[in-house]
Amino acid sequence: MSIKGIIAGLGNPGGQYEKTRHNIGFMVINKLITITSASKLSGKKFYCELWKTTTIIDNYLLAKPQTYMNLSGEAIHPLVEWYNITKDNLLVIHDELDLPIGKMKLQQGGGTAGHNGLKSIIHNLGTKDFYRLRIGIGRSPLPSENTVNWVLGHLSMKELTTLNNLFPTIFDALSFFIKDEKETAIRMINSFTLSETVNLS
């Protein structure tokens, strides 16, 4: 099986974390699994759930680390090592507090903005130069709300609807990303604007 790259969505395993803001990475992978009719592989030795598709993303694995968010690197690192994946062909999808819901950013490298999943991956890989798809969750409209409570809080129906409207653009951009047309993918994601902004207050 020839594997060129990995698309990993970050989140926390367990039903209690489904549809929480911190699990947006998992949600994107779940959508890709459905769209591409991906088949599940054994990822136990990597502490990951893994899928392979024979459609448009046929040379990339879809991965969901099962280590909990703050230890994501302990799953990503052995997976990258086993398949000999370069930093240019690793894409990590995660939630982003510093972007409003409905906005996305695709970039290579950069900081962590305090995201513990990214910190763990950078620590374990020894590089920050992999690609990230940052999906905005915004910050709580309540100044007194703890950040941890916010990211572990469940998405509202309005937020879920907004996220669903992102998926067509994400899928189209990924179709360019895997063909090494990464600048095209970056332009598609970074220029995307919803017709209606979402007010969480």
From Swiss-Prot:
Family annotation (InterPro entries): Pept_tRNA_hydro (IPR001328), Pept_tRNA_hydro_CS (IPR018171), Pept_tRNA_hydro_sf (IPR036416)
Catalytic activity, reaction form: an N-acyl-L-alpha-aminoacyl-tRNA + H2O = an N-acyl-L-amino acid + a tRNA + H(+)
GO-annotated cellular components: cytoplasm
Keyword Cytoplasm: yes
Active site: H22
Residues flagged as site, Stabilizes the basic form of H active site to accept a proton: D95
Site positions for Discriminates between blocked and unblocked aminoacyl-tRNA: N12
Enzyme Commission number: 3.1.1.29
Signal peptide: none
Origin: domain of life: Bacteria
Compartments (UniProt record): Cytoplasm
Broad EC category: hydrolase
Pfam families (alphabetical): Pept_tRNA_hydro
GO BP terms in the entry: protein quality control for misfolded or incompletely synthesized proteins; rescue of stalled ribosome
Positions annotated to bind tRNA: Y17, Y68, N70, N116
UniProt GO molecular function: peptidyl-tRNA hydrolase activity; tRNA binding
Keywords: Cytoplasm, Hydrolase, RNA-binding, tRNA-binding
Subunit structure: Monomer.
Family statement: Belongs to the PTH family.
Annotated function: Hydrolyzes ribosome-free peptidyl-tRNAs (with 1 or more amino acids incorporated), which drop off the ribosome during protein synthesis, or as a result of ribosome stalling. Catalyzes the release of premature peptidyl moieties from peptidyl-tRNA molecules trapped in stalled 50S ribosomal subunits, and thus maintains levels of free tRNAs and 50S ribosomes.
Protein name as annotated: Peptidyl-tRNA hydrolase
Species whose genome carries this gene: Lawsonia intracellularis (strain PHE/MN1-00)
Lineage of the organism: Bacteria, Pseudomonadati, Thermodesulfobacteriota, Desulfovibrionia, Desulfovibrionales
